[in-house]
Structures are given as C-alpha cells and as structure tokens.
Amino acid sequence: MEITEDSKRKINYQIRLATLSDIDQIIRINRSALPENYPYYFFVEHLKEYGQAFYVADLEGEVVGYVMPRIEWGFSNLKHIPSLVRKGHIVSIAVLEPFRKIGVGTSLLQNSLKAMKDTYNAEEVYLEVRVTNYPAISLYKKFNFREVKLLKHYYADGEDAYLMAAPL
C-alpha cells in the first residue's frame, strides 16, 4: 500500500489493488470521465484475471481513479524483427476531474506497470489513446511510451488513436 500526499492541495490518497467491491465506483468513474464505456462483467473479468496489476486511487474510502490492464501474448510493438512477447495492455485508465494534475494518474500507472513487469513478466506495454488527449499523451511519454502507429477512425465517434508502447 502506498500513501501519496499532494503538496499543492494537501490531499492524501492511497494507491491500492482494486477489489470486487470497488467495481461500481470504477464504472461510475469510467462513465463520467471517458466516452468509451464497458459493461460490469468486463471490469469483473479483468479484475479476476489481472487483479495484481488493477489499481485504484482511494481517498477516504472513495475511489477517485483506476487503471485496468490485461496481459497477453502478441507481436511486439517495439521490436523491428517480428517476435512474440508477453505484453501488458492498459485497457482503461481514468481519474475524476477534481483529482487530475496532482499525480494520481502517475501513481496509478507507475504501480500497474511495475506489477505487469514483476508479477506477470510482461516485456512491454501498450495502449490506445485519442490523438487529442494531450494530457494523457504527456503522462504516457513520462513513462517512455512512444507513438508507434496511427489508428485511423479507431473510436466509435470516428476520432483517430495513437497506439503507444513502452518497454518494461
């Protein structure tokens, strides 16, 4: 368990592994913060399968952010010679608006990436992000993600996405 204090607003939040009892709050955050939403069972399945890398930010019992990953085998997004690797996939990450820009997303991502590497033996990680989501792209670049590919019309509303990847 990690306690983080934000010096700007004196907010103490805890980064911890998600539990089944967090799912309703995670779905609430997903629906309020992102246009891409998933059904209840999708979150439950990811928690059951990849729970050691599925983290939430907890502020006095209220979940204010989450990161939902999965682990898979596939072709490397980073190597020039095609090779199969075990890789992490950040399926969804979101933080409630009042808790953005104070390090919550950074802490969530840091913990999940470490678990992907240490617990699940992933060699690299990837994600998709809207090309206009500049704050998220900036966050990912802090973790050495790079834009690997442009995915045209990736989202339901027609917006393009970047496929971004980083070594672990």
Swiss-Prot record:
<dbReference type="InterPro" id="IPR045047">
    <property type="entry name" value="Ard1-like"/>
</dbReference>
<feature type="binding site">
    <location>
        <begin position="140"/>
        <end position="142"/>
    </location>
    <ligand>
        <name>acetyl-CoA</name>
    </ligand>
</feature>
<dbReference type="InterPro" id="IPR006464">
    <property type="entry name" value="AcTrfase_RimI/Ard1"/>
</dbReference>
<keyword id="KW-0479">Metal-binding</keyword>
<keyword id="KW-0963">Cytoplasm</keyword>
<comment type="similarity">
    <text>Belongs to the acetyltransferase family. ARD1 subfamily.</text>
</comment>
<dbReference type="GO" id="GO:0008999">
    <property type="term" value="F:protein-N-terminal-alanine acetyltransferase activity"/>
</dbReference>
<feature type="binding site">
    <location>
        <begin position="93"/>
        <end position="95"/>
    </location>
    <ligand>
        <name>acetyl-CoA</name>
    </ligand>
</feature>
<feature type="binding site">
    <location>
        <position position="89"/>
    </location>
    <ligand>
        <name>Zn(2+)</name>
    </ligand>
</feature>
<dbReference type="GO" id="GO:1990189">
    <property type="term" value="F:protein N-terminal-serine acetyltransferase activity"/>
</dbReference>
<feature type="domain" description="N-acetyltransferase">
    <location>
        <begin position="13"/>
        <end position="168"/>
    </location>
</feature>
<dbReference type="InterPro" id="IPR016181">
    <property type="entry name" value="Acyl_CoA_acyltransferase"/>
</dbReference>
<feature type="binding site">
    <location>
        <begin position="101"/>
        <end position="106"/>
    </location>
    <ligand>
        <name>acetyl-CoA</name>
    </ligand>
</feature>
<comment type="function">
    <text>Displays alpha (N-terminal) acetyltransferase activity. Catalyzes the covalent attachment of an acetyl moiety from acetyl-CoA to the free alpha-amino group at the N-terminus of a protein.</text>
</comment>
<feature type="binding site">
    <location>
        <position position="133"/>
    </location>
    <ligand>
        <name>acetyl-CoA</name>
    </ligand>
</feature>
<feature type="site" description="Plays an important role in substrate specificity">
    <location>
        <position position="36"/>
    </location>
</feature>
<comment type="subunit">
    <text>Homodimer.</text>
</comment>
<dbReference type="GO" id="GO:0031415">
    <property type="term" value="C:NatA complex"/>
</dbReference>
<feature type="site" description="Plays an important role in modulating multiple conformations of loop regions and contributes to protein thermostability">
    <location>
        <position position="76"/>
    </location>
</feature>
<feature type="binding site">
    <location>
        <position position="155"/>
    </location>
    <ligand>
        <name>substrate</name>
    </ligand>
</feature>
<feature type="binding site">
    <location>
        <begin position="101"/>
        <end position="106"/>
    </location>
    <ligand>
        <name>CoA</name>
    </ligand>
</feature>
<keyword id="KW-0012">Acyltransferase</keyword>
<dbReference type="GO" id="GO:0120518">
    <property type="term" value="F:protein N-terminal-methionine acetyltransferase activity"/>
</dbReference>
<dbReference type="InterPro" id="IPR000182">
    <property type="entry name" value="GNAT_dom"/>
</dbReference>
<protein>
    <recommendedName>
        <fullName>N-alpha-acetyltransferase</fullName>
        <ecNumber>2.3.1.255</ecNumber>
        <ecNumber>2.3.1.258</ecNumber>
    </recommendedName>
</protein>
<dbReference type="GO" id="GO:0046872">
    <property type="term" value="F:metal ion binding"/>
</dbReference>
<feature type="site" description="Plays an important role in modulating multiple conformations of loop regions and contributes to protein thermostability">
    <location>
        <position position="83"/>
    </location>
</feature>
<feature type="binding site">
    <location>
        <position position="133"/>
    </location>
    <ligand>
        <name>CoA</name>
    </ligand>
</feature>
<feature type="binding site">
    <location>
        <position position="128"/>
    </location>
    <ligand>
        <name>Zn(2+)</name>
    </ligand>
</feature>
<feature type="binding site">
    <location>
        <begin position="93"/>
        <end position="95"/>
    </location>
    <ligand>
        <name>CoA</name>
    </ligand>
</feature>
<feature type="binding site">
    <location>
        <position position="38"/>
    </location>
    <ligand>
        <name>substrate</name>
    </ligand>
</feature>
<dbReference type="Pfam" id="PF00583">
    <property type="entry name" value="Acetyltransf_1"/>
</dbReference>
<keyword id="KW-0862">Zinc</keyword>
<keyword id="KW-0808">Transferase</keyword>
<dbReference type="GO" id="GO:0004596">
    <property type="term" value="F:protein-N-terminal amino-acid acetyltransferase activity"/>
</dbReference>
